[in-house]
Amino acid sequence: MKDKRLRFGIIGLGKMGLLHASLVNVIPEVELVALCEKSALMNRLFKKVFSTAGIKIVDDLEKFRGLDLDAVYVTTPISSHSSVIKELFARGIVRNVFVEKTLALNYEQSKELCAIARNVSGINMVGYMKRFSVVFGKAKELLLQGDLGELQKFEAYAYSSDFLGLTKKSKSSASRGGALSDLGCHVIDLALWMFGQLEVTDVLSAEKNEAGSETSIAFTASNSSGLTGQFEISQSMKGYRMPEFGLSMECSKGRIDVNDDRLSLTLNTGIQRRWHRHDLNDAVNFYLGDSEYYRENFEFVNSLLTNRQCELSFENASMVDYVIDQVRSRSS
């Protein structure tokens, strides 16, 4: 990678696009060069906001050509990820891409993007930021140490109250991709990170709206070693104004319970230990949203600077879409 500052562009200026724009803009090695937003109203607004910042505002990604970009962030709706990324590659605009979760609308699209990305030979990443949580990271560290013995089973959940009280006629969940793509994908990725590749074995329950989009779902899965686990995902769970993700892991010598903010270790001998987020050096250089977002962006930048593929590459992240497709196939 070149010695000069990395030149970044961002496509899609919704909540996530603005978050990533703010974060990369404070990383010294990055220069935010251009933003792409198709909405005429938003385009005019951002031209006023960034008029003195030297950032180019465009309404078509074709206008990214000639800007000598090192990487582009794709933060458009999930349904457009595949077409936008393919266009970036086909037009030779950029080789390095960060895309918000999920990689694509389904596993077939994800496989196609992986194949194209291999041919382009760039660096790519998908935004499963929970892997950058100090709490979940500590849980994985404890698991790998081996002091808990053999991992026997796990439970995983992802809850929010976003659609609590809405009727089945509401299409709000569908507009965000459904509970699996919008919410459950994060805890599925955490499980893949902790336990390896998973195969769905059964769908226990599913609630869908009239658009056919799941609002809550429960399913079981297992890995090649025979480890079994259960997932519960809901966008209409009471008491979760902010989304929460959690895992419980039962081992032969104890168990781990972890969510976004705290971790507990309980040994069969009766010994207990607890950690909270603030106990685990959660500080970052710039805080916006959650600290995980800064670490995620810094990891992408560092991968570009050192010319190494990200752990959360298209290839690895496509396995989340693989699991989601299995669940949807069984629940249809």
Which positions does each model-derived feature cover?
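C-terminal helix-rich "cap/oligomerization" subdomain common to oxidoreductases
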Residues: 1-2, 71-74, 224, 299-332
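Active-site loop of classical SDR/Rossmann-like NAD(P)-dependent oxidoreductases
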Residues: 19, 41, 284-298
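Beta-loop-alpha module in the N-terminal Rossmann-like domain of NAD(P)-dependent dehydrogenases
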Residues: 20, 52-116
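Hydrophobic residues in well-ordered beta-strands that form the structural core
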Residues: 98-99, 124-126, 258
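Rossmann-fold dehydrogenase core element
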Residues: 110-130, 150-154
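Predominantly a Rossmann-like dinucleotide-binding segment in NAD(P)-dependent oxidoreductases
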Residues: 130-209
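Contiguous beta-strand/loop segments that form the cofactor/metal-binding neighborhood of enzyme cores
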Residues: 189-262, 294-308, 325
